Amino acid sequence: MSETPDDLDELRQQRMEELRDQADGQQSQTSDNTAAAQEAAREKAEAQQEALLKQHLTDGARQRLNAIEMSKPDFAEKVKKQLVTLAQSGRIQDRIDEDQMRELLQELKPDSKSYNIRRR
């Protein structure tokens, strides 16, 4: 079994390539599992959020929130997070109706910038 140094180098090279291929396969499989787990966790959190909102909002308030979500998705997300926080902390006793939702939206509404234009 006397192999020449060239044969040994060639065998080493083949073995290194096999090991690299195995490592690449494991990494891609691990990243797929991680992405799937993150997606499942995100969906679970969204389902919990929707359940809390359904529990604490009347139909009118939910319709108002959905209308805002269509026009201003970022603002609607901020409102939803605030409502979930209030519900989880126990600061919402009854269901929020449309009038209370209007008040909450007024409080959370970003300050509008006003510009004064002076003519000279």
Curated annotation (Swiss-Prot):
<feature type="compositionally biased region" description="Basic and acidic residues">
    <location>
        <begin position="10"/>
        <end position="23"/>
    </location>
</feature>
<feature type="compositionally biased region" description="Polar residues">
    <location>
        <begin position="24"/>
        <end position="34"/>
    </location>
</feature>
<dbReference type="InterPro" id="IPR022889">
    <property type="entry name" value="DNA_bind_arc"/>
</dbReference>
<dbReference type="GO" id="GO:0005829">
    <property type="term" value="C:cytosol"/>
</dbReference>
<dbReference type="InterPro" id="IPR036883">
    <property type="entry name" value="PDCD5-like_sf"/>
</dbReference>
<keyword id="KW-0238">DNA-binding</keyword>
<dbReference type="GO" id="GO:0003677">
    <property type="term" value="F:DNA binding"/>
</dbReference>
<dbReference type="InterPro" id="IPR002836">
    <property type="entry name" value="PDCD5-like"/>
</dbReference>
<dbReference type="Pfam" id="PF01984">
    <property type="entry name" value="dsDNA_bind"/>
</dbReference>
<protein>
    <recommendedName>
        <fullName>DNA-binding protein HQ_1105A</fullName>
    </recommendedName>
</protein>
<feature type="region of interest" description="Disordered">
    <location>
        <begin position="1"/>
        <end position="55"/>
    </location>
</feature>
<comment type="similarity">
    <text>Belongs to the PDCD5 family.</text>
</comment>
